[in-house]
Structure formats: structure tokens, C-alpha cells
Design a protein with these regions (language model features):
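N-terminal capping segments
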Residues: 24-104
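Aromatic (phenylalanine/tyrosine) cluster motif
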Residues: 4, 21-23
Length: 219
């Protein structure tokens, strides 16, 4: 009888523990209803056809606007992040408060400031791989999560992206990090952290990307 009772306690604890850590025994992290709405919103921005590298763009719409421009044409990762956040009524450093040039580096610094805290941004805490699990879980719950790194050379762009709500296993997160949607040299509606930040990472697991979550759910 005692052995049966211990077995029953273990069986009852399994779903509780998997719920606490956000992972089902088989299914991994799942996208919740608010996360599905956020994912649909991100996809509606059509990042694969707007905010295209090599063209000067209207930062809010991503449409090319100055064909004769010779500056501000490189990539538009931080402008895409800023535009998405603005449409969700969430403030992150953006024009006209800072120009598009080197905006990701400036956003990286700003997100660690009291102004960012007042705007609802908080750092996602943790170490590899728990940090990736937490960032993906928050996005899956419908929170806006930014992945960002600053270039050691402040005259060279950093990189910024949004964590995309997506079902994920612990193994997948350990191997490649959270799912992202991003503009860059090539724009992607879905790409892993390892692939999307590849040119900025000295190795894997990496320790240069920071994650910030806004405390207001858009949906």
C-alpha cells in the first residue's frame, strides 16, 4: 500500500512539475491563444517584402522611400522592431528620438535604462539554456520579447529581432535558441536565434544576446 501511495504521488506531481516549467512531457513549449494572435500580427507585417536591406525605408512601414539616398540603406532590423512595437502601442527607442543609423546599438543601451523600465521593459533573466526557454515561453504567452546585441565597435551596427511565438522542445532551444522574426541582410518571418544572429555570435552557446520582455500583453 505504501509503495502504491508513493507511485500515485509521483504520477500526480508530473503534470504539476511540467506545468511549472512550461514543458509537457512530450509536447514541449506550446503557443497559447494570446501568443497565436501575436504571431499572426507579426506575420501580417510582411517582413520578407518590406524593410529590405540596401534601400532607404520609411521606418514605420518598411517601404522604400528614398531611392537616391546613400546613407541609412544597409539593414533595418531595429527599425522593424520599433515599427512592430509602435503598432502594438509599446514604446522602444525609435525615430525621431534616435535615427535609423546604428539604432540597434542605441536600443541595446536604452533597454537597460530607467526609461525602458518605465515603458514596461524588463530583462529576461537566466543562463543558457533556461534563458532561451523563458524567452520563448513569454512570447508563447503573448508578450513582446526583444532579442538584441550591441556591436563591440559602436560604429558598426548591432542586431535586434522579435521572439516569435512557436512550439519548441527543450532540445531545439538548446541547439538553436528561440524562434525569431527579423529584418536584416536577409529578412525572415521565422528563423532561429543561432541562425539569425550568426554573424554576431562568437560561438555557441552564446553569451552576447540579451532578451527584454514588455509587461503589457497586446492581445
Amino acid at each position: 500500500m505504501a509503495i502504491f501511495s508513493r507511485m500515485m504521488r509521483k504520477i500526480l506531481l508530473l503534470p504539476l512539475l511540467s506545468g511549472l516549467f512550461g514543458f509537457g512531457i512530450q509536447s514541449g513549449l506550446q503557443v497559447e491563444p494570446a501568443g497565436r494572435q501575436l504571431k499572426e500580427f507579426y506575420f501580417s507585417l510582411d517582413v520578407e517584402h518590406l524593410w529590405i536591406a540596401g534601400s532607404h525605408v520609411n521606418w514605420e512601414t518598411g517601404a522604400a522611400d528614398k531611392p537616391e539616398a546613400t546613407a541609412g540603406n544597409h539593414t533595418h532590423c531595429s527599425a522593424f522592431v520599433a515599427a512592430a512595437c509602435k503598432r502594438l502601442n509599446i514604446y522602444i527607442l525609435r525615430p525621431p528620438d534616435h535615427g535609423q543609423l546604428l539604432l540597434a546599438n542605441a536600443q541595446y543601451d536604452w533597454l537597460a535604462s530607467p526609461a525602458a523600465l518605465e515603458a514596461g521593459w524588463k530583462p529576461v533573466e537566466g543562463i543558457y539554456p533556461t534563458l532561451y526557454e523563458t524567452a520563448q515561453r513569454l512570447a508563447n504567452q503573448g508578450y513582446v520579447v526583444v532579442a538584441i546585441c550591441k556591436n563591440p565597435d559602436e560604429k558598426v551596427p548591432g542586431h535586434a529581432a522579435l521572439v516569435l511565438p512557436e512550439n519548441a522542445s527543450r532540445e531545439k532551444l538548446e541547439d538553436a535558441g528561440p524562434a525569431l522574426i527579423m529584418a536584416g541582410t536577409h529578412n525572415h518571418r521565422m528563423i532561429t536565434l543561432a541562425a539569425g544572429f550568426k554573424s554576431h555570435l562568437p560561438g555557441w552557446p552564446e553569451h552576447v544576446v540579451k532578451f527584454y520582455c514588455n509587461d503589457r500583453k497586446p492581445f
